[in-house]
């Protein structure tokens, strides 16, 4: 039990916080929906419970993915977090569908605008509490995004610059950030809809907002699914590949890179390179020293956990060009050292 607890502590903190907050908000919105029957509140309730469920899955998955490699899984459990995220978005997709369906039904068969002032206060109050709490979670997730991107996290940066650096975050952090962006904006839209419905009597707006929130949820589903499907298969990291190539070519004993691949395993990066040396008379000891020097520098980079380097004799052809992407499909002569 202690071993399991220590493992769970390694999980994404933003996912755990988001799961707890969304469960509390979902329960609050459920009570508000029972009292008022408001459709926009129903959409928000479904969204909160969906977020709570999949963020709980993501928290557990991100923790288990940190397990050390073993004989059965020599490359570790890194891709497990991608698989968990794929499972999580299925839940979001189902809830998004139900939200849109309920919204369309309300548009086609609008009920009379609720003139009960107490109901209005309940709905507005619950949504306002939700916006405040979701903004707090969004701020925490944005801060985690910036920490993983090695950027300043002070002031309003988590709510501003985090959007531009979202792709540098871990899959679990990115999922929480995206979902809470939708949750916060959805809460604002739902609050506006309830106010408009109260002031104008236009009850259909609640159904329209329900559809909008459902479509926003589907956007999260599509984006998270595509990114994590690529991660589960094994996607290259072009930014790290470019950085690694410059580190390798800074070594005075390396003249060219024949092949370089950086593959993501969850948050971990595995690097494989075939490099050219200008002379063929290096001893095994010298090659081992060169390899050790390059590998040591590469392993200092964030998330790089494994480096494999092979040597070839220089072939007088310049193969590596910065920014050309992974060289995995480039043909190369197999005569190596």
Per-range role (PLM):
Residues 35-45, 76-87:
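Alpha-helical transmembrane segments and their helix-start/interface "positive-inside/aromatic belt" motifs
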Residues 62-79, 109-113:
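Aspartate-rich (DDxxD/NDxxD/DxxxD) Mg2+/diphosphate-binding motifs
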Residues 1-28:
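Topogenic membrane-insertion module of multi-pass membrane proteins
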